[in-house]
């Protein structure tokens, strides 16, 4: 029986949607048990005097009745409910909150914009991999939060009174997706961002992370259209032009954009375009979590790990009883190989980190069965929650693990969008060779292998004199590997030193 003392819930009464996250604490991390989201569009119920309409209140209360049933099983001290921009603004917020608290049976805290920004940053820091120095952007329904920080520590926190619902009502109320409406929406957003831009740029960032429905929608569009996962200004401009071509909000059709997200997509896109231009952002990645995760981790008082991906990999190794010595052996070989060919194959630090992760969990499929272990590994990685890894990075890991041995599925390597297909293919080749050379599972059996690569993807494996004759089983595996790689036009040549 699941102990209720291990359960935690976080509820966010946002301007566009109400969200509930229910988790269980497991070995210093969290396991998601439920995510419930309902579009309430509370901000659309505000009039010119900031009075919240009774209809909007009813939509909110109806949603909270759904949430309240799940909360009955969780200790009150382990539930946190916060309200954001619209309920900060509404002059009759107390009327809504009084009934809402009766429905939920627990207090609701209306948090300031700065506190919202801090919680968002905290959620990102606990769930998102990559460099420590970051800029976090969260476009909500009624406000937009911008935060810079390093590691667990937020440095500058800003909350701006603009959101995808308020910008929809202000600039797209006629449902016209013309150039003029977009320009007005963008210009107004740029004027909001401009005063704080110098302070944000002064702190600087190594990575920009987006933690909102707008960014999630962009990610879904890019995956559907086979683009890589990084959001750039040129991609945003392309999507803006596509929206303008559609003409009307009711006729907005972009491959990968769901009907649920379509209504507030143009307004959110306008705000994001303004932020990119005012701050000079080169690219943005999707965050692993935000406000609700910040609330949960705040209740758990768990420290922010320096490397979230390493924590995730360690948890997988423990959970699936992986041979960590063998994983490290394969990883070190792969790192050595990638170092030898990094100049010719242009393998940067990001590529090497993802290859390292794949090596450390490459045997996870054995926990299901030896037969079809690579397919089992890919299935597990596709469907497990992997904090610190983006959806595209998860897909790449699954693809590499599925192609770690036997025949090579070239289309699968082209379908992932974390890295260019050619780069993913090169990582796959290195992983396969590292697994073969480490197959005896002992350090003293690893040969001094040298790799030589060229730009035409010809790869030469140079072995010590007489090694192939002395190691017939691995020699046979390498010969078979040469055939498999050559079959997909990856020339692999085996040589012995003279």
From Swiss-Prot:
Pathway noted in the entry: Purine metabolism; ppGpp biosynthesis; ppGpp from GTP: step 2/2
UniProt catalytic activity: guanosine 3'-diphosphate 5'-triphosphate + H2O = guanosine 3',5'-bis(diphosphate) + phosphate + H(+)
UniProt-listed GO biological process terms: guanosine pentaphosphate catabolic process; guanosine tetraphosphate biosynthetic process; nucleobase-containing small molecule interconversion
InterPro entries to which the protein is assigned, alphabetical: ATPase_NBD, Exopolyphosphatase, GppA/Ppx_hydrolase, Guo-5TP_3DP_PyrP, Ppx_GppA_C, Ppx_GppA_N, PyroPPase_GppA_Ppx
Gene3D superfamilies xrefs: 3.30.420.40, Exopolyphosphatase. Domain 2, Hypothetical protein af1432
Positions of transmembrane segments: none
Alphabetic keyword roster: Hydrolase
Entry keyword annotation includes Hydrolase: yes
Gene Ontology molecular function: exopolyphosphatase activity; guanosine-5'-triphosphate,3'-diphosphate diphosphatase activity
Role: Catalyzes the conversion of pppGpp to ppGpp. Guanosine pentaphosphate (pppGpp) is a cytoplasmic signaling molecule which together with ppGpp controls the 'stringent response', an adaptive process that allows bacteria to respond to amino acid starvation, resulting in the coordinated regulation of numerous cellular activities.
Family per similarity comment: Belongs to the GppA/Ppx family. GppA subfamily.
Protein name: Guanosine-5'-triphosphate,3'-diphosphate pyrophosphatase
Source organism: Serratia proteamaculans (strain 568)
